[in-house]
Swiss-Prot record:
<keyword id="KW-0949">S-adenosyl-L-methionine</keyword>
<feature type="binding site">
    <location>
        <position position="95"/>
    </location>
    <ligand>
        <name>[4Fe-4S] cluster 1</name>
    </ligand>
</feature>
<dbReference type="GO" id="GO:0005737">
    <property type="term" value="C:cytoplasm"/>
</dbReference>
<feature type="binding site">
    <location>
        <position position="84"/>
    </location>
    <ligand>
        <name>[4Fe-4S] cluster 1</name>
    </ligand>
</feature>
<dbReference type="GO" id="GO:0016992">
    <property type="term" value="F:lipoate synthase activity"/>
</dbReference>
<protein>
    <recommendedName>
        <fullName>Lipoyl synthase</fullName>
        <ecNumber>2.8.1.8</ecNumber>
    </recommendedName>
</protein>
<comment type="similarity">
    <text>Belongs to the radical SAM superfamily. Lipoyl synthase family.</text>
</comment>
<feature type="binding site">
    <location>
        <position position="117"/>
    </location>
    <ligand>
        <name>[4Fe-4S] cluster 2</name>
    </ligand>
</feature>
<feature type="binding site">
    <location>
        <position position="110"/>
    </location>
    <ligand>
        <name>[4Fe-4S] cluster 2</name>
    </ligand>
</feature>
<keyword id="KW-0004">4Fe-4S</keyword>
<feature type="region of interest" description="Disordered">
    <location>
        <begin position="1"/>
        <end position="22"/>
    </location>
</feature>
<feature type="domain" description="Radical SAM core">
    <location>
        <begin position="96"/>
        <end position="313"/>
    </location>
</feature>
<dbReference type="Pfam" id="PF16881">
    <property type="entry name" value="LIAS_N"/>
</dbReference>
<dbReference type="InterPro" id="IPR006638">
    <property type="entry name" value="Elp3/MiaA/NifB-like_rSAM"/>
</dbReference>
<dbReference type="GO" id="GO:0046872">
    <property type="term" value="F:metal ion binding"/>
</dbReference>
<feature type="binding site">
    <location>
        <position position="89"/>
    </location>
    <ligand>
        <name>[4Fe-4S] cluster 1</name>
    </ligand>
</feature>
<keyword id="KW-0411">Iron-sulfur</keyword>
Length: 338
């Protein structure tokens, strides 16, 4: 089997003796990004000298419109965060211009150090108990019909933040009874049972948790996470709330092979996952995991065809696809087929 170092040549194990700066002490509320964020991960990242040139099929419109500014102002007004901004999503302009956003709850500081992600790492502040109400007010102000709620990882919380998700769902439904809610949850490491018990009592309309990459690359891309744990989380939720569609996604371009992607897709179906997203990984900075390949649109289309053959109710597969991209359309198609 190909080693992580062979598949991802810009990564070196931590036993490498090359001198590097001492990791910065993490203080509560201080956000670490870039080199400081990834200083303690198991596999060292050598900063990329130059970001790779994107192919012609990856072109993103600059997000400039009155609607983009309006939504940003509304988020600041209610002390909210959008994953669109925090994770530097390439679809920010399209989604904001269309009057939609994916909300990120429980702060903007994550307890994990995933080197593909542009969200900052650190010791989070205590939960904002007013956030569920503020989120509900913002969604009502925007008159949204479909909302995606995600979060940073909160390994500091006994339930991983599951109760906060439930509180947000209740507040939103109280002010916007017709809204459909998709939650994109963390893996609830070490807290699966308690988190799922809470979630099952106040379930979303779609339950989403991303596998992100193939198991061979987990040590490099998802330190602190476990591939089989994530699959079990999705399957156990489905067993508890069988009428709610489950969803997961992968980034392509981290060093995986097409065969590995197909194998993960099969494992997803074995764990009763209904919906799939596949998108191109784009390196946020020179201190993040390097892009190993740009997957051609034809290959994304082939993955979609294979996914439907496997029985997925909906497959969104393309270079700029992200978990919440056109999530309302995905959910509509999936529920029609359930």
């Amino acid at each position: 089997m190909t080693t992580v170092q062979e598949a991802v040549p810009n990564l070196i194990p931590t036993q490498d003796v090359t001198p590097r700066p001492a990791p910065k002490k993490v203080e509560a509320g201080v956000k670490l990004r870039g080199a400081e964020k990834v200083a303690r991960i198991p596999v060292k990242i050598i900063p990329t000298e130059e970001l790779p040139k994107k192919p012609d099929w990856i072109r993103v419109r600059i997000p400039v419109s009155p609607e983009v500014d309006r939504i940003k102002q509304l988020l600041r007004k209610h002390k909210l965060h959008s994953v669109c901004e925090e994770a530097s999503c390439p679809n920010l302009g399209e989604c904001f211009s269309g009057g939609t956003a994916t909300f990120m709850i429980m702060g903007d500081i994550c307890t994990r150090r995933c080197p593909f992600c542009d969200v900052g790492h650190g010791r989070p502040k205590p939960l904002d108990l007013d956030e569920p109400k503020n989120l509900a007010i913002a969604i009502a102000d925007l008159r949204l019909k479909y909302v995606v709620i995600t979060s940073v990882d909160r390994d500091d919380l006994r339930d991983g933040g599951a109760q906060h998700f439930a509180d947000c769902i209740r507040e939103i439904r109280a002010l916007s009874p017709g809204v459909q809610l998709e939650t994109l949850v963390p893996d609830y490491r070490g807290r699966m049972d308690v988190a799922l018990e809470i979630t099952a009592q106040t379930p979303p309309d779609v339950f989403n948790h991303n596998l992100e990459t193939v198991p061979r690359l987990y040590k490099a891309a998802r330190p602190g996470s476990d591939y089989d744990w994530s699959l079990d989380l999705l399957q156990k939720f489905k067993q508890m709330v069988p009428h709610v569609p489950t969803k997961s996604g992968l980034m392509l371009g981290l060093g995986e092979t097409d065969e590995e992607v197909i194998e993960v897709m099969h494992r997803m179906r074995e764990h009763d996952i209904d919906m799939l997203t596949l998108g191109q990984y784009l390196q946020p900075s020179r201190n993040h995991l390097p892009v190993q390949r740009f997957v051609h649109p034809d290959t994304f289309a082939w993955f979609a065809e294979e996914g439907y053959k496997m029985g997925f109710k909906n497959v969104a597969s393309g270079p700029l696809v992200r978990s919440s991209y056109h999530a309302d359309q995905q959910a509509h198609e999936a529920k029609i087929k359930l």
